[in-house]
């Protein structure tokens, strides 16, 4: 229900074109995805903590968004929110960051309280996405990031119905992009760059569609050769309970925020639909 845009580059760049002036830029997409926006930018891609900007307002009406488009880096993790769980607050706005790690998500995992475990960092907000990120960080093995992401996908599939598990994750060295569910994901390689996006931003370029259950690994030190692999396999994908969750689809702005906050409260109280 959200929009994600990621990029890696051999040299520091800005993605101002993709954010503002491309044929289908994020600022235009934000007219329908108006529950907030955020971006984590890694300037050097050497495992440093990213520079994070995020606001719980629509990007198209927020001057901070235009100012943020000039940020330069080698890894970008950008997100437009269309709230389904959790109100319009800063703590519910993606990407979520913990140290050098950043995470943004497109989809709804309706029984997300099942991701809460003793010993894991408590969420600051009410979103399913932050619960996913905190569970991942609780179980993360920095020596085996793809294995850790596989465990997250397996956990979500086994514990809840969902519309999408599409996510962007970065450890400050690489960008990982995963697709599973009803929402699309696309990728593009340019000289010295690679991008991944929920929507095709520049239709005149050679975008490719990411298939179900494919994890892409984009390396800023080798951006023109992204790696792709299946993550959980056919058996678990077949067992996944994928649902559109169409309630509240017509809502926008504050009305959507109120709906998402009330829905999260119901789920947290144990009355997940």
Give the ranges of each region predicted by the language model.
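Extreme N-terminus nucleophile/cap motif
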Residues: 1-57, 177, 194, 213-215, ...
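Conserved catalytic micro-motifs used in adenylation/nucleotidyl-transfer and phosphoryl/amide-
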Residues: 2, 92-110, 154-216
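Short, compositionally biased leader-like segments
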Residues: 8-10, 42-44, 49-78, 132-135, ...
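Short helix/loop capping segments that flank catalytic or ligand/cofactor-binding pockets
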Residues: 15-16, 50-52, 86-88, 105, ...
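A short, Trp-centered hydrophobic/proline-enriched beta-strand micro-motif
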Residues: 38, 75-79, 166
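Cytosolic regulatory regions built on CNB/CRP/Popeye-like sensor folds
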Residues: 48-56, 100, 111-121, 273
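Short acidic (Asp/Glu) patches
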Residues: 55-67, 78-99, 115-117
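Short histidine
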Residues: 110-171
């Amino acid at each position: 229900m959200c929009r994600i845009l990621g990029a890696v580059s051999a040299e520091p760049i800005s993605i101002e074109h993709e954010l503002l002036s491309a044929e289908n830029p994020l600022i235009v997409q934000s007219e329908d995805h108006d529950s907030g926006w955020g971006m984590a930018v890694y300037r050097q891609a050497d495992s440093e903590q990213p520079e994070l900007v995020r606001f719980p307002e629509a990007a198209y009406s927020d001057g901070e968004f235009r100012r943020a488009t000039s940020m330069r880096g080698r890894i970008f993790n950008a997100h437009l929110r269309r709230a389904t769980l959790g109100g319009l607050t800063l703590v519910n706005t993606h990407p979520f960051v913990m140290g050098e790690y950043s995470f943004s998500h497109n989809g709804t995992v309706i029984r997300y309280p099942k991701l809460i475990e003793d010993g894991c960092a408590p969420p600051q907000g009410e979103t399913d996405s932050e619960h996913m990120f905190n569970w991942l960080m609780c179980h993360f093995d920095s020596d085996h990031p793809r294995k850790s992401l596989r465990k997250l996908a397996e956990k979500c599939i086994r514990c809840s119905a969902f519309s999408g598990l599409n996510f962007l994750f970065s450890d400050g060295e690489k960008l990982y992009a995963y697709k599973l569910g009803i929402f699309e994901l696309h990728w593009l390689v340019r000289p010295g760059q690679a991008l991944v996006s929920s929507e095709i931003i520049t239709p005149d370029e050679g975008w490719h569609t990411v298939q179900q259950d494919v994890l892409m690994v984009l390396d800023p030190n080798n951006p023109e050769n992204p790696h792709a692999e299946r993550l959980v396999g056919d058996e678990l994908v077949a067992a996944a309970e994928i649902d559109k969750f169409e309630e509240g689809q017509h809502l926008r702005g504050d009305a959507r925020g109120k709906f998402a906050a009330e829905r999260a409260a119901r789920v947290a109280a144990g009355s997940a639909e």
